Amino acid sequence: MSAPAVHTLYFEDLRVGMRETLMRTVMDEDVIGFARISGDDNPIHLSERYAATTRFGQRIAHGLYTASLISAVLGTQLPGPGAVYRSQTLNFHAPVKIGDVVTVVVEVVELVPEGRQARLHCEALVDGKVVLDGEAEVSVPARPREGPREGPREGPREGPREGPREA
């Protein structure tokens, strides 16, 4: 079994308005795994009994688990491989529960040639309601001057995308 081909979008390929979408169903294993990796074992994420006594009434996913789905889009789709985070703002509007289907939308809103920076609006939605939003700034690699060109792949588009990608 071979690894999938890596498709890189270089800074020169990006345009304001390009967007990419990812869908992910939050599974119990995701929340448990995130707790293990992050060390955040707050019982609101892991204990049904404890979570039932909170204002949410049930377990919720870690906010940064939801935010990590933004990172997945930035690192694999838009801009994709080679993009490096510079900053990320996050505003949490509502909890994400186990079983929720999260749709993450990332859109290029500004390109800064000096330093090959891209600013992207990011949001996560559940049932059409924004549960998290913010902005990311990333550095994007320049197209190599010589050698074979691997570039742009089908994927990020301007405007709405038909059917989000399932993770």
Segments from the language model and where they lie:
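A generic structural signal for short beta-strands and their flanking turns/coil linkers
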Residues: 16-18, 22, 30, 40-42, ...
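Short, intrinsically disordered/low-complexity patches at protein termini
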Residues: 44-46, 56-57, 84-85, 90-91, ...
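Catalytic strand-loop segment that frames the active site of acyl-thioester-processing enzymes
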Residues: 2-61
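HotDog/MaoC-like acyl-thioester-processing domains
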Residues: 1-16, 96-167
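Hydrophobic beta-strand-centered segment that forms part of the acyl-chain substrate-binding groove
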Residues: 52-61, 65-105
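Generic structural detector for well-ordered beta-strands
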Residues: 21-26, 91, 137-139
